[in-house]
């Protein structure tokens, strides 16, 4: 079984089978309570799937793009769970969940706050399934892209409202089956935090 976690928007957890089929899921839309939500959501998903931590063979985590604090919470929980069980942790870009089996170029857009969008462009994979990333995630001024935009520069525009952790698992499993290399487990922060530790 696979445990999948994403905290790039709200906080979302799912348990899937080895192929990425969802068995249980839970989420919180509150973008300010990641730390309070993550533990109970994991416990609920395991219980709903009628399994224990010992039944989990891999963890998939969304690595953003997302805000500094939210991403840290979800990724830390995923890595801690995997470390405790001595199982692999797989990293997937959160935007990838909006681009499974697309048939045209697609621009995935999420709210980066401070008057900006976070954007990632994708192109369809010739074999179907998870799309290929054709641009690294970049920031765009909100003034350049209205919230009701459906097409830009030849690409369909999709705005992120939520991220499905079960689809994260599907993407990870599919990419590994195709022999593709997954991302390094590093967060794709929208920007660095306002407050940093002194050197």
Walk through the language-model features, giving the residues of each.
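Oxyanion-binding and handling regions
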Residues: 1-22, 29, 33-37, 90-199
């Amino acid at each position: 079984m696979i445990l999948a976690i994403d905290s790039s928007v709200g906080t979302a957890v799912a348990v899937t089978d080895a192929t990425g089929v969802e068995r249980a899921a839970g989420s919180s839309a509150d973008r300010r309570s990641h730390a309070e939500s993550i533990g109970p959501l994991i416990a609920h998903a395991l219980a709903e799937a009628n399994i224990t931590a010992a039944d989990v063979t891999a963890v998939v985590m969304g690595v953003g793009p997302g805000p500094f604090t939210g991403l840290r919470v979800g990724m830390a929980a995923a890595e801690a769970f995997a470390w405790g069980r001595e199982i692999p942790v797989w990293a997937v870009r959160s935007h990838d969940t909006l681009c499974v089996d697309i048939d045209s170029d697609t621009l995935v857009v999420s709210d980066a706050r401070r008057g900006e969008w976070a954007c990632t462009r994708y192109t369809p994979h010739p074999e179907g399934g998870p799309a290929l990333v054709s641009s690294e995630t970049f920031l765009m001024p909100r003034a350049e892209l209205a919230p009701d935009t459906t097409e830009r520069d030849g690409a369909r525009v999709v705005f992120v409202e939520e991220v499905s952790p079960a689809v994260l698992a599907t993407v990870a499993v599919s990419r590994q089956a195709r022999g593709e290399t997954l991302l390094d487990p590093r967060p794709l922060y929208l920007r660095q935090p306002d407050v940093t530790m002194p050197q």
